[in-house]
Amino acid sequence: EAETFEAELAWLLLNQRCAFNSPVWFNIGVDGVPQQASACFILSVDDDMDSILNWYAEEGRIFKGGSGAGVNLSRIRGSAEPLRGGGASSGPVSFMRGADASAGTIKSGGKTRRAAKMVLLDVDHPDVEQFIWCKALEERKARVLSDAGFDMDLDGADAHSVQYQNANNSIR
C-alpha cells in the first residue's frame, strides 16, 4: 500500500494535479525545522491577560513554522467596560495592534512571505464599529502618507507606521 500511495502521490505532483501547502514545502523533511504541516490554526482567546499574551506567543510560533492563524476576539470585553481591579478595558481592537505588529515582524517560516492572519469579531460585540473602521482609517493614513512622498509600498521603509495591515478582518 505504501508503494502505491507514493507512486500515486508522485504522479499527482509531477503532473501538477495537486500541490502541497506552503508549510509542507517549508518544513517537512528539513533538518532543524519544526515538522509543521498544517496551513492554518484556529486559536481561542479568553478575556484575561494571560490568555491574550498566550495568543501572541502561539501566533508567533505558528507563523515561524510557515502557517497562518485565525482568531475570534469576541470573548474580550469591549473597550471602556469595567475591569475587576478598577479602570476600563482596552477592548479587542487595542490588542489587535500588538498582534498585527508581531505578524508584520515575523516572516512566515523564516522566508520572505508575510504571516497569514485572520481576525474575527461577532456582529453584536460592543466594539464592532471600532473593529470595522480601524483598518479603513489606517489605509486612509497610508494614502495620505504616500501622497506626501513617504515610501508606503508593501515592504516600503515607511509602511511599518500603518497599523492593522497584516490581518484579514471579518465580522461573524
Per-range role (PLM):
Residues 1-172:
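Extended catalytic cores of very large enzyme megasubunits
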